[in-house]
């Protein structure tokens, strides 16, 4: 006897960082590095930050007579290991969501009060 599937609502993944944000790494081997978010993966809660978590990949030669290559590439890190970074005051901060006078919902840094969006 097969069980009926319940009507599940689609899962909505919410991230505190977006592509293009400037973030600071707060944990791991790349701690205190600052970089720009290149890509966001909400399903796994991971982000790729420019110049952080570099991995080397050895590529075989494609054709005969061609030499192989060694490529360094950024690997994803978990989003809980990064904080938004204020370039004006050089400080990392958590974010909160507020509304502007015209009713738009924006992200704001808690330490500095700087509006990001």
Swiss-Prot record:
InterPro entries recorded: KOW, Rib_uL2_dom2, Ribosomal_uL24, Ribosomal_uL24_KOW, Translation_prot_SH3-like_sf
Annotated transmembrane regions: none
SMART domains reported in the protein's UniProt record: KOW
Domain of life assignment: Bacteria
Single GO term (MF): rRNA binding
Keywords: Ribonucleoprotein, Ribosomal protein, RNA-binding, rRNA-binding
Pfam families in UniProt: KOW (PF00467), ribosomal_L24 (PF17136)
Gene Ontology CC annotations of this record: ribonucleoprotein complex; ribosome
GO biological process, one term: translation
Subunit (UniProt): Part of the 50S ribosomal subunit.
Cross-referenced PANTHER family: MITOCHONDRIAL RIBOSOMAL PROTEIN L24
Family: Belongs to the universal ribosomal protein uL24 family.
Function: One of two assembly initiator proteins, it binds directly to the 5'-end of the 23S rRNA, where it nucleates assembly of the 50S subunit.
Protein name: Large ribosomal subunit protein uL24
Lineage: Bacteria, Bacillati, Cyanobacteriota, Cyanophyceae, Acaryochloridales
